[in-house]
Regions:
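Active-site gating loops and adjacent loop-to-helix segments of metal-dependent hydrolytic enzymes
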Residues: 101-144, 196-251, 363-386, 391-392
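Outer-membrane beta-barrel translocator/channel fold
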Residues: 355-363
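Generic hydrophobic/packing signal
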Residues: 93, 125-127, 160
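Non-catalytic, alpha-helical, charged scaffold/linker segments
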Residues: 129-222, 415-433
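An N-terminally biased module of ancient metal coordination in phosphate/nucleic-acid-related enzymes
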Residues: 1-118, 242-269, 273-274, 279-355, ...
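Intrinsic low-complexity, glycine/proline- and repeat-rich
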Residues: 383-434
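General structural signal for secondary-structure boundaries
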Residues: 48-52, 80, 163-192, 205, ...
């Protein structure tokens, strides 16, 4: 195994392996792209933070960001790896929250296919000195999520037993396969990967697997039927996991309760540590690039109302994935973000090996602002690690659209200087407060 992607090694060992590996490697020219939404082995991903950074560099990206579920553990490694590669980094975490428990949006399907009223949020640009506080805040949420996931594993094993198949061992096949012992999170994908492996062992590979899924009532999308029936498919577990997430998870799913913060609490915590809380826009889905989401309606019917609620809760940023949305959806989100004075952050979910790190949409002129905002975030994280007062958006309050544009224009060049290797404390001398 490539040492940069060996999850059994320490973070220092992986970054040391990276520095050795890149000595003789010829990398491509930089492209005007970034990705601020990469999952690593500290939630669910085939990649360590070091290897994710390396793959991003091989794709020509200049900035990469990690947002693991309920975990900040990837941050120091991602930062060190990107520095070795001459890249910028933006680190944080992803979390689910009760968005509007006492308001009119409670019970609405937001950006979460599994739960009404519960939203995916990210907290990005976490200053390095705040990582310990972030980990302490997330730890009980990880523990509660593990308990719930173990209960769902019991439900999944009941299904397997009913099919006459050997169940999986939640401890060895799910928990031990994660980085939970090292501050990583446990997600439904860990559960479904264990279940997928058990189904493959039980039904066998090839057409027998597809036939077995049919006996479970699983609808296999036409686009994935060939891959699931291919006995030589090297990504079979990931492909089957995606189908199970879209088509079967609801049969074993237990709704989260005590592990959830409210959106207001997430915003307050992010502000307290100098990070930036965001709402992750999904939008109505017609077809999922990864096969893990069914065609379904999400926020678009009430998006104006949602942005009003986001502003009322103190959210100062929105993140979205340009490849997953239509031009009309993207234009509308951009217009609303500008009207509400919200920073726009781009990123493409990376959690399985078929996904490309590139986001060619960001090369289009209309998305130039997203690249500049990313560079401003690079500066924000590094500079606020030196001086908390150098927060891109200011520690509290909301910037007007013109002032926000000015801050991005000032901070983006500083982010590039940091990626070029200049010390953050030196760059901080040229930064101003919001």
């Amino acid at each position: 195994m490539d040492a940069t992607n060996d999850a059994t090694l320490s973070q220092d060992e992986r970054t040391a392996a990276l520095r050795e590996a890149i000595r003789g490697e010829a990398f491509p020219e930089w492209v005007p792209e970034s990705n601020n939404h990469i999952h690593t082995c500290y939630s669910f991903s085939p990649y360590t933070p070091t290897h994710a950074a390396l793959l991003a560099r091989r794709a020509g990206l200049r900035v990469v960001g990690s947002v693991d579920h309920d975990s900040i553990a990837a941050a120091p490694e991602m930062t060190a790896a990107t520095r070795a590669l001459g890249m910028g980094s933006v680190t944080g975490f992803e979390i689910r929250a009760r968005f509007d428990p006492d308001g009119p949006l409670d019970g609405r399907k937001l950006n979460n296919p599994d739960s009404a009223g519960i939203a995916y949020m990210t907290v990005q640009g976490v200053p390095a000195p705040a990582r310990a506080a972030v980990d302490a805040w997330l730890a009980p949420k990880r523990q509660a999520r593990l308990r719930r996931t173990l209960a769902m594993a019991d439900e999944a094993n009941t299904v397997l037993a009913g099919l006459g198949l050997e169940p999986f061992d939640p401890c060895s096949d799910m928990v031990a396969a994660s980085q939970y012992a090292h501050g990583g999170g446990i997600t439904e994908r860990h559960l479904l990967a264990a279940m997928a492996s058990a189904l493959i062992r039980g039904f066998g590979r090839g057409p027998a697997l597809v036939a077995g899924l049919g006996t479970m009532g699983v609808t296999v999308p036409a686009a994935l039927a060939g891959a699931l029936a291919d006995p030589g498919n090297p990504h079979l577990v990931f492909d089957l996991l995606g189908v199970l997430k879209a088509e079967y998870l609801d049969r074993v799913y237990i709704q989260p309760t005590d592990e959830l913060a409210t959106a207001d609490e997430v915003v307050a915590f992010a502000d307290s540590v100098g990070a930036i809380a965001t709402y992750a826009y999904l939008g109505d889905v017609s077809a999922s690039p990864t096969g893990d989401k069914k065609a379904e309606k999400f926020e678009d019917d009430f998006l104006d109302e949602l942005f009003d609620a986001m502003e009322a809760k103190g959210l100062r940023a929105v993140t979205y994935m340009p490849p997953r949305n239509t031009p009309a959806q993207l234009e509308r989100v951009h217009r609303l973000a500008a009207a509400h004075g919200m920073l726009e952050i781009s990123g493409v979910d990376i959690n399985q090996p078929r996904q490309a790190f590139n986001c060619p949409e960001l090369r289009r002129p209309e998305f130039a602002g997203l690249n500049e905002a990313t560079w401003a975030l690079v500066a924000h994280e590094a500079l606020s690690s030196v001086d908390p007062a150098l927060h891109l958006l200011g520690r509290t309050g909301r910037l007007g659209p013109d002032r926000l544009a000015q801050r991005i224009a000032q901070y983006a060049p500083l982010g590039r200087r940091i990626a070029d290797g200049e010390a953050a404390d030196r760059v901080a001398e040229d930064a101003t407060r919001a």
